[in-house]
């Protein structure tokens, strides 16, 4: 195999190895070449990554090589890490979010009546993820806080407007809002 193909395979092996990394001896065994040849190819690849506008570099930690992101782009990677995802929310938070999405503006007490359990922790989580916010105060004793969804909610779930939420049909009116919401998300992701 030529050097170009060898470097392509090494690149793939580094990717497959992930954060664990891979020993040059392992690469040499896979490629059926000497370790020195692997080290030379990796060195060339490191220089190529340094000299170009690439987001990745090849680093060596504790005798293994792996891909790592470049420090100069760290602020962008942090934005991705800080972006909330549905996968990072608990079942209780997702159920509460579904209720808010379909019934907004809604008070905490109304949410608890629908769910049948307290929603304090779920509300805190959703507010901290910027998926819901206070939208005002309800009339009545104590003037309870009203909650509604945010732009981040729309972005996170790939919606342009709340009108993109599937409508509640007559047969679905008896369904739990959370079940309907999860079904709706599955439809949106197809």
From Swiss-Prot:
Record GO cellular component, one term: cytoplasm
InterPro entries per the UniProt record, alphabetical: ScpB_csome_segregation, WH-like_DNA-bd_sf, WH_DNA-bd_sf
Record protein name field: Segregation and condensation protein B
Keyword check for Ligase: no
Domain of life: Bacteria
HAMAP family: ScpB
Localisation: Cytoplasm
PANTHER family listed in its UniProt record: SEGREGATION AND CONDENSATION PROTEIN B
Keywords attached to this entry: Cell cycle, Cell division, Chromosome partition, Cytoplasm
UniProt KW Cell division keyword: yes
GO BP annotations listed: cell division; chromosome separation; DNA replication
Family, similarity comment: Belongs to the ScpB family.
Subunit and interaction comment: Homodimer. Homodimerization may be required to stabilize the binding of ScpA to the Smc head domains. Component of a cohesin-like complex composed of ScpA, ScpB and the Smc homodimer, in which ScpA and ScpB bind to the head domain of Smc. The presence of the three proteins is required for the association of the complex with DNA.
Biological function: Participates in chromosomal partition during cell division. May act via the formation of a condensin-like complex containing Smc and ScpA that pull DNA away from mid-cell into both cell halves.
Record lineage: Bacteria, Bacillati, Bacillota, Bacilli, Bacillales
């Amino acid at each position: 195999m030529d050097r170009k193909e060898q470097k392509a395979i090494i690149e793939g092996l580094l990717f497959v190895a992930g954060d664990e990394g891979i020993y040059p001896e392992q690469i040499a065994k896979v490629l059926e070449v000497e370790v020195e040849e692997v080290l030379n190819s990796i060195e060339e690849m490191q220089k190529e990554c340094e000299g170009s506008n690439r987001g990745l570099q090849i680093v060596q930690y504790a005798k293994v090589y792996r891909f790592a992101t470049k420090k100069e782009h760290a602020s962008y990677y942090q934005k991705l890490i800080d972006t909330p995802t549905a996968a990072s929310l608990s079942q209780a938070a997702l159920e509460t979010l579904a209720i808010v999405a379909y019934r907004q503006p809604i008070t905490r007490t109304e949410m608890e009546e629908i769910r049948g359990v307290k929603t304090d922790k779920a509300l805190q989580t959703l507010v901290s993820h910027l998926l819901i916010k206070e939208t005002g105060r309800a009339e009545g004793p104590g003037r309870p806080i009203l909650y509604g969804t945010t732009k981040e909610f729309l972005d996170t779930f790939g919606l342009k407007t709340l009108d993109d939420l599937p409508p509640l049909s007559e047969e679905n009116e008896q369904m739990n809002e959370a079940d309907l919401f999860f079904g709706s998300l599955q439809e949106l992701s197809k």
